[in-house]
């Protein structure tokens, strides 16, 4: 008689599995290429009826089962399995390079190790009979997965043969119900004895005690069959037969191939010859899955064409950032960055560059505020605009810039708001309700965002956002340009920051200053009475992108610092030598960066908060809290009002008195006898 032939098991990795594998590799494994366990399910074969050309003409067609690996392969708790499916555990190895994946010796070692583990399990009461191995290389950038499944099967020697034909099984529903009640989805094969309705079941490891040897009961094995062929059982039976023969000395048995519907079959099997009495040798094992072409070679799953382009873009944006955590900065908190809501006040040169770099860091929520339109001089310096945006008087900058951001990356939530910012020294009428509405709208925007960028082209336009940012405790990053110089700074966070002590250096208890803390005069109208070269932004073209990049990097460093907005000022020397855990993984978090292109130099500067500052002092904040817009109206209309509120006018008078008192001193008398 010819040896029994088995139908190979087919793998069925789902798109959800590849997505889960990519996420697990990117977010958890990173460079770790250790093999790890995964779960899958074996689904049995079934037969279905299909209609032919005539309505009353049908055919019975067999469909093979398979090993299905789904999106829950990495989860300890699996969802509900289909009826008659069996849960199995396998080994996954994700290689870091395609060259490692192609190395045949590495795959052979993994296969041999899995076979050894299976043989060792035969000495326990829970033999592993359905192991599988998956080796893969994931090209996460192109969404291409090279993979190869193996289903190790031990070769029985002598071979098993059929004693007759496979026949239909009576009482199959009783057997199926018994399998569900005893083993649920955890066992692919079990022992059976008795007749309905008095059937009994037991695990294979109980073979020596389950049957009554005095009555010469025939061993009956039920296994979930993945083959739909009439005379060829599925691949999983090979290990069952080897185990029963090698471990329990079984030389003949009845096998019931449990399949879907009414297609289950049974047959009597026996060894073709008595087992050898020679010393046992390690059994031969086979099981690498063949390519659809019939060759023993890996397969490729290309998910790129199947994926939504928008989702592809989102995953690609995150990919480069997550790769930073693999080797360079494992402590980088990308979720904190992506969840930060950024408000950009100014959609000009600085605003365009800042927005682009924020998207590069994975920031998903960006709001741009501007009141101007795109002019013909803008597109060459402001990368979010094109020539067509300048036509017919020009499109509004903020909504246009937001639209361009979404064209670059559809996953960004970009909003554009046309809004003018009221400024000190720019009077408003007493009946101008629109200004009050603009103030309320601006405050609502500041309140609803986490970080505020001041990117306007005048000094006084930054005053109101400075006040609002301090009031609501936001991270405020300021960037200003000169012809060949720039300033990038973050504002202090208020009273809370002043109480923070920093042992490794930085400013003292007063906290960090704001844009106006070095001024001894209130901001005033700097836009009127200017020549053309003063009205236009005249600066070296490379200064803006440099300043914009530093502004964004400063924000990211603040977000990564354990103290966040309250992070004290650091210098490179203190950040490198500090043993404190309260540092940013990105390095030092400075207060101010002052750059000069003429000298190719950038300086780190620290500035304490000024208690009479016109932008962030308690005098200003308390006055705004008390009088609201009435206070702002006086600031806009009265040139010296801020100086009175903060006490700068008294400081002037005291200084003048000191100077007057020093006029009578003889400075040349020092040292005379």
UniProtKB/Swiss-Prot annotation:
UniProt source species: Cryptococcus neoformans var. neoformans serotype D (strain B-3501A) (Filobasidiella neoformans)
Keywords attached to this entry: Autophagy, Cytoplasm, Protein transport, Transport, Ubl conjugation pathway
Alphabetical list of SUPFAM superfamilies matching this protein: Activating enzymes of the ubiquitin-like proteins
GO biological process: autophagosome assembly; autophagy of mitochondrion; cellular response to nitrogen starvation; piecemeal microautophagy of the nucleus; protein modification by small protein conjugation; protein transport
Catalytic residues (positions): 536 (glycyl thioester intermediate)
Disordered: annotated segments: 268-293
GO molecular-function term, one example from the UniProt record: Atg12 activating enzyme activity
Subunit structure: Homodimer.
Function of the molecule: E1-like activating enzyme involved in the 2 ubiquitin-like systems required for cytoplasm to vacuole transport (Cvt) and autophagy. Activates ATG12 for its conjugation with ATG5 and ATG8 for its conjugation with phosphatidylethanolamine. Both systems are needed for the ATG8 association to Cvt vesicles and autophagosomes membranes. Autophagy is essential for maintenance of amino acid levels and protein synthesis under nitrogen starvation.
Pfam families per the UniProt record, alphabetical: ATG7_N, ThiF
Official protein name in the record: Ubiquitin-like modifier-activating enzyme ATG7
């Amino acid at each position: 008689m010819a040896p029994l032939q088995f139908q190979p098991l087919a793998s069925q990795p789902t798109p959800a599995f590849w997505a889960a594998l990519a996420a697990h590799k990117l977010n958890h494994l990173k460079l770790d290429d250790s093999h790890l366990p995964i779960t899958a399910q074996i689904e049995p074969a079934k037969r279905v009826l299909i209609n032919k050309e005539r309505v009353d003409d049908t055919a019975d067609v067999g469909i093979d089962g398979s090993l299905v690996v789904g999106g829950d392969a990495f989860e300890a708790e699996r969802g509900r399995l289909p009826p008659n499916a069996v849960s199995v555990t396998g080994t996954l190895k994700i290689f870091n390079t395609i060259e490692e994946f192609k190395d045949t010796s590495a795959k052979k070692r993994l296969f041999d190790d899995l076979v050894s583990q299976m043989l060792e399990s035969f000495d326990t009461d829970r033999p592993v009979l359905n192991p599988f191995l998956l080796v893969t290389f994931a090209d996460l950038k192109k969404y291409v997965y090279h993979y190869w499944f193996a289903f190790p099967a031990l070769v029985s020697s002598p071979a098993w043969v059929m004693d007759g034909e496979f026949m239909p099984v009576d009482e199959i529903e009783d057997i199926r119900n018994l399998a569900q009640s005893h083993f649920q989805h955890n066992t692919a094969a079990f022992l059976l004895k008795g007749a309905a309705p008095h059937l009994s079941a037991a695990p294979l490891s109980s073979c020596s005690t389950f049957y009554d040897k005095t009555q010469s009961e025939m061993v009956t094995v039920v296994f979930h069959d993945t083959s739909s062929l009439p005379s060829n059982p599925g691949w999983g039976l090979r290990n069952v037969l080897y185990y029963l023969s090698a471990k329990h000395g079984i030389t003949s048995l009845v096998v019931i191939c449990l399949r879907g519907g009414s297609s289950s079959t049974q047959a009597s099997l026996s060894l073709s010859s008595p087992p050898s009495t020679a010393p046992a040798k390690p059994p031969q094992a086979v099981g690498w899955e063949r390519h659809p072409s019939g060759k023993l070679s890996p397969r490729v799953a290309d998910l790129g064409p199947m994926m939504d382009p928008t989702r592809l873009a989102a995953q690609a944006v995150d990919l480069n950032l997550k790769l930073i955590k693999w080797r360079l900065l494992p402590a980088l908190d990308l979720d904190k960055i992506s969840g930060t809501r950024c408000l950009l006040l100014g959609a000009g040169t600085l605003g365009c560059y800042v927005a682009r770099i924020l998207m590069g860091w994975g920031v998903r929520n960006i709001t741009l505020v501007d009141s101007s339109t795109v002019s013909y001089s803008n597109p060459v310096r402001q990368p979010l605009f094109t020539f067509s945006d300048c036509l017919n008087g020009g499109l509004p900058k903020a909504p246009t810039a937001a639209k361009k951001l979404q064209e670059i990356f559809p996953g960004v939530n970009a909003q554009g708001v046309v809004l003018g910012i009221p400024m000190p020294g720019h009077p408003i009428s007493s009946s101008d309700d629109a200004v009050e509405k603009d103030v309320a709208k601006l405050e609502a925007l500041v309140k609803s965002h986490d970080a505020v960028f001041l990117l306007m082209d005048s000094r006084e336009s930054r005053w109101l956002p400075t006040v609002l940012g301090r009031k609501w405790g936001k991270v405020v990053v300021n960037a200003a340009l000169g012809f060949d110089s720039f300033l990038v700074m973050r504002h202090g966070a208020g009273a809370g920051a002043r109480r923070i002590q920093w042992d490794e250096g930085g400013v003292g208890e007063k906290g960090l200053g704001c844009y106006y803390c070095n001024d001894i005069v209130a901001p005033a109208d700097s836009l009127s009475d200017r020549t053309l070269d003063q009205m236009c932004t005249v600066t070296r073209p490379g200064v803006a992108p440099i300043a914009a990049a530093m502004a964004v990097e400063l924000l990211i460093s603040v977000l990564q610092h354990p103290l966040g907005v309250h992070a004290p000022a650091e210098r490179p020397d203190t950040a490198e030598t500090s043993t404190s855990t309260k540092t940013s993984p990105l390095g030092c978090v400075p207060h101010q960066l002052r750059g000069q292109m003429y000298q190719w130099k950038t300086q780190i500067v620290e500035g304490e908060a000024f208690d009479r500052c016109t932008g962030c002092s308690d005098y200003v904040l308390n006055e705004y809290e008390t009088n609201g817009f009435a206070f702002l109206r006086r600031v806009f209309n009265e040139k010296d009002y801020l100086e009175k509120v903060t006490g700068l006018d008294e400081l002037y008078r005291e200084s003048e008195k000191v100077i007057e008192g020093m006029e009578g001193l003889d400075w040349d008398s020092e040292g005379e006898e």
